[in-house]
Amino acid sequence: MTEQSQPGKPASSEPATPSEPATPTEPREMTEARQAMVEKQLLPRGIADPRVIQAMKTTPRHLFLPAEAWPIAYGDHPLAIAAGQTISQPFIVAMMSELLSPLPEDAKVLEIGTGCGYQTAVLVALGYQVHSIERIAELSRGAQKTLGELDSLPAELLVGDGMLGNPPGAPYDAIISTACARKVLPAWIDQVREGGLIITPVKRFGGRQYLMRYTKQGRRLSKDDLGLVRFVPLLRGVE
């Protein structure tokens, strides 16, 4: 659930094979728009993992949006969804997914902020055991419906406070947050395994947000700063 952002990465030379329709009834223009998204937005910015490219080519972003938004569903920008939230810019979804590339395909991943379910669907397409938590029940219900129709339901879809993580499913190989925290939450550190990853935007002094990848080393976290981003804030509680 992000606003537009442009962290820099070297361009990929990976050619994009033609996209296939995500569903038997998918309009051709949606298939073509998704192919163009990969070729014009992802590859030039350095998205190179073949698994991520394939997941982005086969996950129908437009189905996570109302029909009136379909003509702009594959644009290089976030879009508004229900409850005052947004569906992330495609590049950000691809980038955050690619940051998980060191993990094995069956890794257990906790997603903080299901939103409409688009990032969730990409993670499922990558083969991860996805546990996803959303604080807004309306969004969780909508995501469950769409993901179910696409046969992309995660291992667990929960309504709850993402700041608390999901202790019953721990330990996780990675935790990925689609909302901006002021710091890495202690619950997340507790629930990720030794050597596991935490990928989250973090707000620093001055209000700027940075996408960070942390690796757990005991009670310490090593960190990689991946550049400026803009995400919706991580909030406490359940609605």
What positions do the PLM features span?
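Class I SAM-dependent transferase core
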Residues: T2-K9, P21-L110, A121-V122, L126, ...
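Polar/charged low-complexity regions in secreted precursors and cytosolic/nuclear IDRs
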Residues: E14-P15, E20
